[in-house]
């Protein structure tokens, strides 16, 4: 078992395995490989560790790559087991609980599913950052009394983005800005012109320009994530042996905000053999996220009550 820390890891094995059953290792990669070497020399096959921050990830992945069965456990579960003595270290206590089978491993996806989850989580962080930059743009516009949001339902829609890019490019004429109006926009040209008559100040224009540039960067990175997600799904499909029938008609054809930039339904159907979006309330992205978090094999949860 390993007591994971930021600057060092304390490893403990059974006293019958070595004359020095508790050892301390650093956190550099060569330290982690020495830790794995020591476990192998002592005949260790399974290792338990607590999920401490993100510090567990490097040692977990290296041990898995070296062929160990690694159990990631919730620190709360280990602390609530009675009978601990005061003269025993955290690593020794964790090792003893593991030896007697008293630890419950947290579910962690493996292989391509783990990669899929990582790409999806990175994508969500980028979408959240994009929303922050949109708020910064809205603030800059309001400070200049440019009330685009009152005449355009979505400032990041076709009309809104055209107007924002024109402003950043140097256009100030309300008539010229209003000419960017999309034919589907409900507001008339005159109303848009009045809304686009602003108090142009250099510092607010600068903030708008930077927020728009950062938004564009986030969107570019989201597209890059989508490509990684699509490629990962294709690799998962190649590994799966699911019978693929005909894809049923979509329950809804409405495109959701921040939707993934490829046909998620078709990709998931090829992986799973069923269309999860036929379940009421389960859209393409939510189905994709479910697969990314839980994988394609739900045997880790014997029943719905275990799914927490």
What is the predicted role of each segment?
Residues 1-308:
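A detector of single, family-specific signature residues
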